[in-house]
């Protein structure tokens, strides 16, 4: 997925969760870039056969098994993205933290909270 599509998807998720703030746009942009890189690494990983280990020949001529660089990139991007998802309130822990700080928009216009409120729960 492209960076702009990721930006739209992330912003929509923030709005639905009630956590969107205008000043989060730069964080959303950074996260979208990370996810675009992850998607490209995923494509490369799949095109290479999806093997978690590859053979690598070092300068000395010795051949060793090593982690697939594309898989390493995917794992790194996922770890970095998780921190951003959390900061945006798009994980349970992140949502709770933003709620504790009073940064959640109560009039989000959807979501589980509105459904539960409509049911009187």
Tell what function each PLM region has:
Residues 26:
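Residue-centric detector for conserved, function-critical "anchor" positions
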Residues 29-104:
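Amphipathic alpha-helical protein-protein interaction segments
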Residues 5-22:
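Short, charge-rich amphipathic alpha-helices with coiled-coil/heptad character
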Residues 6, 37, 77, 108-111:
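Alpha-helical structural motif
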Residues 9, 16, 83, 96-121:
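Charge-dense (acidic/basic), low-complexity helical/coil segments
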């Amino acid at each position: 997925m492209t960076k702009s599509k990721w930006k739209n998807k992330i912003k929509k998720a923030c709005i639905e969760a009630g956590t969107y703030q205008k000043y989060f746009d730069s964080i959303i942009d950074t996260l979208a870039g990370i996810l675009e890189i992850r998607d490209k690494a995923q494509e490369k990983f799949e095109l290479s056969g999806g093997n978690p280990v590859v053979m690598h020949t070092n300068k000395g001529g010795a051949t060793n098994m090593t982690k697939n660089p594309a898989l390493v990139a995917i794992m790194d991007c996922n770890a970095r993205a998780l921190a951003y998802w959390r900061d945006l309130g798009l994980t349970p822990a992140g949502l709770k933290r933003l709620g504790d700080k009073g940064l959640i928009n109560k009039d989000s216009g959807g979501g589980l909270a509105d459904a539960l409120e409509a049911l009187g729960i």
